[in-house]
A protein has these predicted regions:
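N-terminal nucleophile
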Residues: 1-319
């Protein structure tokens, strides 16, 4: 088995699916064949799906349509995992261990290999999590006892911890890759081998999963910038608003912007937004402007534009 992905967070089911799909589309090698997918909803429902050929293009079906996104209850699941490789793997249900009370165990190489205790190593991890061990404690305990097993294991427990580790044997391979990311309550781990280009795809897969789970940040407020707004000299590109969040002037440090005329980026992404002397946030939008003699003539080819800002972490006063 060449790739294992596990995630916990909002829409983890969709995140794991899209992460695998992106890897199939960009990568080459032993991928796009069988897939065994599992997800656990917030209320503890286990949902499993399998395919032997086609990977994500046949994993989920809606009527006569293949290659669809997971159904809503799967897409919104809080924990999800998948293991995938080339086509036609025997007993795919044994390659991803799952239990509603414990969590999910995926991985790459041969996670169903029987370990020193006479039980497959992925099932050993699941059994330990059933007994109350965290994902990290369970994976470490099993791989400490089985350093030469041909497996990398990735587990997500019911508390939401996602943890992965390769055995000493797998770490000696020249073609393995992994990536881990955790941000704002969302976590994902990707392990794989035998997929090219093997040094870069893992990071892509994790970022795609995180992007699905975290989504686009929502603005804390809106700023309105109208044509005719003055541009005055300042050491930064910034927007200064009145009590109604309408721009009263924009600052810039470019001589041409203040005194000439032309076309340029006027308000940068992440520009400070002030209400009076108080920093209230940073812009989530970038505008292009046409300016004439120190005033905005057009903002993103319009006479008036509203865009969002994210709230500042601390209240500051402008210099």
């Amino acid at each position: 088995m060449t790739i294992g992905i596990a995630a916990h967070g909002p829409n983890a089911g969709l995140a794991v699916y899209r992460s695998l799909r992106a890897t199939e589309r960009v990568g080459a090698g032993s991928i796009g064949g069988f897939a065994s997918f599992g997800a656990i909803s917030a209320d503890g429902k286990l949902m499993r799906y399998e395919t032997q050929r086609g990977g994500t293009s046949t994993l989920f079906i809606e009527g006569e349509i293949t290659g669809t996104d997971p159904p809503p209850d799967v897409a919104t699941a809080a924990s999800a995992a998948v293991i995938s490789s080339g086509p036609d793997r025997p007993q795919p249900e044994k390659l991803l261990a799952a239990d509603t009370l414990a969590g999910l165990v995926t991985g790459h190489r041969m996670p169903m290999t029987t370990g020193a205790d006479g039980i497959s190593v992925n099932q050993q991890v699941l059994n330990l999590m059933k007994g109350g061990h965290s994902a990290q404690d369970a994976v470490d305990a099993v791989l400490d006892r089985n350093p030469e097993v041909d497996a990398g294991l990735v587990a997500v427990d019911r508390s939401g911890q996602v943890y992965g580790r390769n055995s000493a044997r797998v770490l000696r391979r020249p073609d393995i890759a992994e990536a881990r990311a955790s941000r704002a309550g969302a976590s994902v781990i990707v392990f794989y081998n035998s997929i090219r280009p093997h040094t870069v795809l893992a990071a892509l897969a994790t970022e795609i999963a995180l992007d699905i789970m975290l989504g686009l940040p929502k603005p804390d407020g809106q700023v309105k910038v109208n044509a005719g707004t003055p541009v005055i000299p300042g050491r930064e590109r910034a927007v200064y608003c009145d009590a109604n969040n309408v721009a009263i002037h924009v600052t810039g440090h470019d001589f041409e912007l203040v005194s000439g005329q032309g076309h340029c980026t006027g308000i940068d992404l992440g520009s400070p937004v002030y209400k009076g002397s108080k920093l209230i946030g940073h812009t989530m939008f970038e505008t292009k402007i046409i300016f004439r003699d120190g005033k905005l003539a057009f903002v993103s080819d319009q006479k008036s534009v509203s865009f969002g800002y994210r709230r500042a972490l601390a209240e500051l006063t402008c210099p």
